[in-house]
Amino acid sequence: MKLSELFNPNEFAARHLSFGDEAALLAAVGEKSMDEFVGNTVPQSIRMPSELDLPDALTEADALAKLKGIASKNVINKSYIGLGYYPTRVPNVILRNVLENPGWYTAYTPYQAEIAQGRLEALLNFQQVCIDLTGFPVAGASLLDEATAAAEAMAMAHRVGKVKSERFFVDARVYPQTLDVMKTRAKYFGFELVVSDFAKADDGEYFGALFQYVGKDGDVQDLQDVIGRLKAKGTIVAVAADIMSLVLLKSPAELGADIALGNTQRFGVPMGFGGPHAAYFAFKDAFKRSAPGRIIGVSKDASGKPALRMALSTREQHIRREKATSNICTAQALLANLAGMYAVYHGPEGVKRIANRIHALASAFADALVSDGINVVHKVFFDTVTVDFGNKEKADQVFAAALESGYNLRRVNDTQVAAAFHETSACEDLVDLYRAFTGKDTFAFADDVKGRLNAELLRQDDILQHPVFNRYHTEHEMLRYLKKLEDRDLAMNRSMISLGSCTMKLNATAEMLPITWAEFSDIHPYAPEAQTAGYRELLADMENSLKSITGFDAISFQPNSGAQGEYSGMLAIRRYQEAQGEAQRNICLIPKSAHGTNPATAAMLGLKVVVVDTDEHGNVNIDDLKAKAEQHRDALSAIMITYPSTHGVYEEGIRDICRIVHENGGQVYMDGANLNAQIGIMQPAEVGADVLHMNLHKTFCIPHGGGGPGMGPIGLKAHLAPFAPGHALTDTHSASADQTAVAAAAFGSASILPITWMYLTMMGKQGMEQATRWALLNANYVAKRLSEDYPILYTGKNGRVAHECIVDLRPLKAESGITETDIAKRLMDYGFHAPTVSFPVAGTLMIEPTESESKAELDRFIAALKQIKQEVLKVGRGEWPKEDNPLVNAPHTASDVTGEWAHPYSREEAVFPLPFVREHKFWPSVNRVDDVYGDRNLVCSCPPMENYED
């Protein structure tokens, strides 16, 4: 035995990839070796000239140990900084059974509602929490963060408002990070932001206004009068409200506002150095068709039973494109589920107890300081006590004393210091903080504390009265409720999810473990830099790896979704061109096949979209591109292009595309949605891209979470790097200081970055290169096998696809009347989530198997589609009626096959169409959901409890 052969640092790659299947897969596609296969699939013209410059792989154990060492460099002080981020307690039953459970975090956005009823119910619970606390009848299923939500509220106010003005009022008490993001958005919408004292909001004419409730320094103001005066002028009013304070305070709707928004982080979601967290967004019913983001609605299924679905989806970017209400794609579904379940578990009395405890501790602390002669700035507050010492020296001394005792305070200005209380604050903290503020060791406080909120500010209505918030307060009940919901969903812990352009790959357990380590989860985004050395090292490691992979000169981690990455990349181009004196460049070329987020993003930046045709092979029409680039030469800003193409093909002309755009004065933005087909094979910067966004929740193993979180960092060439997003409160060490932000936190959803770090570290150079090759091989295997039954719409060199393929269902539809939707729903009966339906071509399925699926799983999926083809042919031959067959009736539930049966096909054909289905049957909990009924009768709050009964 050789010891060197018994240690295998590449062990993780063998868990991520199915090396034992290589020979069979290669033989099926007619190749002898992996090198030969790649050579016949990838154009030589794009191949990178050298190998990846990445470290060798580490084992799972060694990678975790190394990351633990990095994490230990973060300092966990008790955070009293506030500004929208607070320590909280994640109930352990929710931590283990939702956040750490692949049944929840590996699911995709619930487009296929019939196999997503569990998380749809959880998201409906979240919406109900937001509806109850804000007082509005409609709430969305989450936005990316509070700052983004505020910017979306501003845009929505302009869409729905009647005031003919381009001016928007911003309360001077809003969080600085919120104002930072609003400045970015306002510039390219052409809005003028007026930041002033809240009481002066009605001094001018504004199309909209935003107020902070509670203010950034802790004060709570009665906004009812000023809102009333603005409403009399027709101004649309938004209120950014602290979610925990709304447990006690009057709702924004009662104050007279039109929109409410904020962060739900305080409801059981760790701070995580800035995210991810679910923002809430609630509004008047009249605005529902203009709202950003997703809304979960109650509809009915084919049997008439209540069923949930995503409502009003025609607002979304993939349908409306440049006319969309926003470019949002990924939201924060997993975090919304955590926040909603926090309210379910604690119930109305539990959250009131927490809110009152926070307020009582802050009030007791303020009382003690006042009795000691210290100037507490605000008499009315919820959780934040701001003190003015009158001189800088004393403020410095107090701040340092608190730091020495392990407490982070907020420095408001030279003479003022603030302490923000929170769910984890304890009576011992009062003693420590009192000592830091006064220098005295003894602190006696009365058990009976008088609150600082005036009676006229307090809500009089009841909250969280729906039975779902009053039933699951014991751990056994909560555990079983979570399990019941999980069992209604099909996630990747059951079967592959082959969604094209979504890259649903393995989210390995070792990758997920570190996100709940306190060293990562308990860090405030604005903690002193000396306390975040571990995060800085993690970011530096990842920056080096991503630069090597992509060939870019700089990386910005701020964008907290793919759509935000797009926006940030195009924003850098716009800023660069303005700095060059070329602000007139406002034309954006976008291929016809592009992701819907592309035109929506371009429109948000004030760019005019010019569509470039594609040829019969699905590639960009070079002649049309050249003509349009030359036509708009003086105004050309950029092209937005996806590579490999959205049609799943390596376009051989990519270098020519980049050259033509550059020759005509434009920049090249590359959409990184398909980066999984590039790593180790090509570098986007080397073929001519100037900026690229990377979906860490696709290519780099962050799970999709049932609709978020995501991360969309951007890679930039040197000339664009100074124009990456900056931040008002944190040194990003990249962008120029004067560049405003795109997200509330400087490094986006930083606490999920360890997932990608672990993936990169455990795969190493060799593993990352192998992953791409396997992604190509699996896709071509699927395409080859399915081509025996279905046309493959687009292929490239040697009849090959890249990492995904498009199956054309239109001929079958013409012959039989069976639609792509029927086939998607029928796949549920076989235990599979459908591939991407009707994108980028109507009447098709786009399949992306990824590298981490075994041949056995691919064969099951292929067998399902082949059997479905035979079922369609039966309909076409008249053996089954067009109006009554297993496809149009799909999916079938357990209730269907145990009740009356009058169909021309058997129960077995309905639910056990192939032998493997019997081994691990997934039962959809509802029949096909009626989308039209749901949109015509929109209900986005929890239905009566009897609807939940089994």
From Swiss-Prot:
Any one biological process term the GO annotation gives: glycine decarboxylation via glycine cleavage system
Names of the cofactor(s): pyridoxal 5'-phosphate
A molecular function GO annotation: pyridoxal phosphate binding
PANTHER family per record: GLYCINE DEHYDROGENASE (DECARBOXYLATING), GLYCINE DEHYDROGENASE, DECARBOXYLATING
Recorded catalytic activity of this chain's protein: N(6)-[(R)-lipoyl]-L-lysyl-[glycine-cleavage complex H protein] + glycine + H(+) = N(6)-[(R)-S(8)-aminomethyldihydrolipoyl]-L-lysyl-[glycine-cleavage complex H protein] + CO2
Keywords: Oxidoreductase, Pyridoxal phosphate
Annotated Gene Ontology cellular component terms: cytosol; glycine cleavage complex
Protein name (database record): Glycine dehydrogenase (decarboxylating)
EC number: 1.4.4.2
UniProt keyword annotation of Isomerase present: no
Enzyme class: oxidoreductase
Function of the molecule: The glycine cleavage system catalyzes the degradation of glycine. The P protein binds the alpha-amino group of glycine through its pyridoxal phosphate cofactor; CO(2) is released and the remaining methylamine moiety is then transferred to the lipoamide cofactor of the H protein.
